[in-house]
Amino acid sequence: MSSSSSMECTGNMSAAPLLVLTVAVLAVLASTCAADPEPIQDFCVAVPRAGGEASPAYPGFPCKPASAVVSDDFFFAGLAAAGSTDNPFGASLKPGNVEAFPALNTLGVAINRVDLAPGGVNPLHSHPRAAELVHVITGRMLVGFVSTAGKYYSKVVGEGETFAIPRGLMHFQYNPGNASARAMTVFNSQLPGVVPAATALFGADPEIPDAVLAKSFQVDAEIIKLLKSKFKK
């Protein structure tokens, strides 16, 4: 073997441990950043509760026996039709999470349909367990979020365009146009969870004390009482 071949071989051998280490680190990062646990089988169609929703268990949900799973278990038509936007927000949200679509159990994904009337808004909220992609199908939506540094990021998103929202950050969708708008929102969790900002603060049960909210927002307690009256269940 020539000296150049020997050097090339030695270089490749010395690079091998670094490559292995890099792959190992990336694998660990991927597993720690995943929103849901990794699946250990091809699928695990969730077993619904008597009321129709899946029965929670961690990680994931109880599995329907594989021998009883059929093609229709992997089909979901719940997002095909628009919901009613005849409400104070001018918005409709149809969930496609594991509770609505049991086949998503252990798959680490979910999808929602958002319909907004002109001037309608999907109010400020956050998803503690997932990042989100907002893909506009028809119309336009102003989509925005606020970072932990207090910086506001936003974009008017048109048909066929997509906007990314990082996990856990407060965000919204708003229809600035004169026609209805529709979007599909996709999550990297089968059950992203949702924390509506206004409802969490002013509609909590039991109530957050007026004094705490008044001091936090630097407003009079009467304003807090008025806001709470809008969100009482």
From Swiss-Prot:
Disulfide bonds join 44-63. Gene3D superfamilies: Jelly Rolls. Its main location: secreted. Residues 77-225 form the Cupin type-1 domain. SUPFAM superfamilies: RmlC-like cupins. GO terms for molecular function: manganese ion binding. Pfam families: Cupin_1. It is found in: Secreted, Extracellular space, Apoplast. Mn(2+) binds at residues 125, 127, 132, 171. Glycans are attached at residue 178. GO terms for cellular component: apoplast. Residues 1-35 form the signal peptide. InterPro entries: Cupin_1, Germin, Germin_Mn-BS, RmlC-like_jellyroll, RmlC_Cupin_sf. Keywords: Apoplast, Disulfide bond, Glycoprotein, Manganese, Metal-binding, Secreted, Signal. Belongs to the germin family. Oligomer (believed to be a pentamer but probably hexamer). May play a role in plant defense. Probably has no oxalate oxidase activity even if the active site is conserved. This is Germin-like protein 3-7. It comes from Oryza sativa subsp. japonica.
